[in-house]
Amino acid sequence: MRAYLAITPPELQRFMDSGSFKAARAWIVNQIQSGDFETDSEEELEFESSLQAAMQSRVMQGPNALGMALAVDLTIEQIGAIAENQVGVLSDLLWSQVQSLLLSESDEPELSWFAAQEIPTYLAQWLA
């Protein structure tokens, strides 16, 4: 299951360094959420979930911070209770589960996409 984790730059650094990360919850696309939007496009629903995670990242850090949504693929064993558009994460995530990072630089509904392999290249800039 694809999920989007709200994460801060220091947390991202620790995740990369250790190879694992404990997350309590993540944002997902599910049938309930699908009915909330006037689209059938899976891509648009994925965007909404990733944007919600990125906005939560900004809330965790402060209004002028970068919002980060880490796209991860959860295993069946990691999927906890699902409530609306969020899922509980039952065990640590591994860096190998990371697919990409979506970055919000403003209050606008726009996200920049970075492949997992690009994250180390930009991390120092995001930490500054």
Which sequence ranges carry the predicted segments?
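Long, hydrophobic N-terminal alpha-helical segment
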Residues: 1-40
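Residue-level detector of solvent-exposed, low-hydrophobicity positions
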Residues: 11, 28, 34, 44, ...
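Structured domain cores in non-transmembrane regions
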Residues: 31-63
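Glycine-rich, aromatic-bearing surface loops/beta-hairpins
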Residues: 61, 65-128
